[in-house]
Amino acid sequence: MSVDAATVRRIAHLARIAVSEGEVPHLQGELNAMLAFVEQLSEVNVEGVEAMTSVTPMQMKKRQDVVNDGEIADDIVANAPATEGHFFLVPKVVE
């Protein structure tokens, strides 16, 4: 897969990035190099390799999930201009 100049312009437009015509060839080369690297990664045989979440072995600390109300709902909505119960009231935006 390769990226052409029109695709670079489209990506820049979608990302809302100003790209001059002089920058397009450079960015095209950069994007093509990235895609070539990703294609190399897809060719690596990872059969039998255990999935990793980190390069260093570690165990995540686990705790019991406890549901509570935080006991500060009144404090949270105290400065809101309009509330109902423990909910913020906001102006209607869509009819």
Curated annotation (Swiss-Prot):
GO biological process, one term: regulation of translational fidelity
EC number(s) per entry: 6.3.5.-
Enzymatic reactions: L-glutamyl-tRNA(Gln) + L-glutamine + ATP + H2O = L-glutaminyl-tRNA(Gln) + L-glutamate + ADP + phosphate + H(+); L-aspartyl-tRNA(Asn) + L-glutamine + ATP + H2O = L-asparaginyl-tRNA(Asn) + L-glutamate + ADP + phosphate + 2 H(+)
Keyword Protein biosynthesis: yes
Keywords: ATP-binding, Ligase, Nucleotide-binding, Protein biosynthesis
Cited InterPro entries: Asp/Glu-ADT_sf_sub_c (IPR036113), GatC (IPR003837)
One MF term in the entry's GO annotations: asparaginyl-tRNA synthase (glutamine-hydrolyzing) activity
Subunit structure: Heterotrimer of A, B and C subunits.
PANTHER family named in the record: GLUTAMYL-TRNA(GLN) AMIDOTRANSFERASE SUBUNIT C, MITOCHONDRIAL (PTHR15004:SF0)
Protein family according to the UniProt entry: Belongs to the GatC family.
Function according to Swiss-Prot or TrEMBL: Allows the formation of correctly charged Asn-tRNA(Asn) or Gln-tRNA(Gln) through the transamidation of misacylated Asp-tRNA(Asn) or Glu-tRNA(Gln) in organisms which lack either or both of asparaginyl-tRNA or glutaminyl-tRNA synthetases. The reaction takes place in the presence of glutamine and ATP through an activated phospho-Asp-tRNA(Asn) or phospho-Glu-tRNA(Gln).
HAMAP family: GatC
UniProt name for this protein: Aspartyl/glutamyl-tRNA(Asn/Gln) amidotransferase subunit C
Gene: gatC
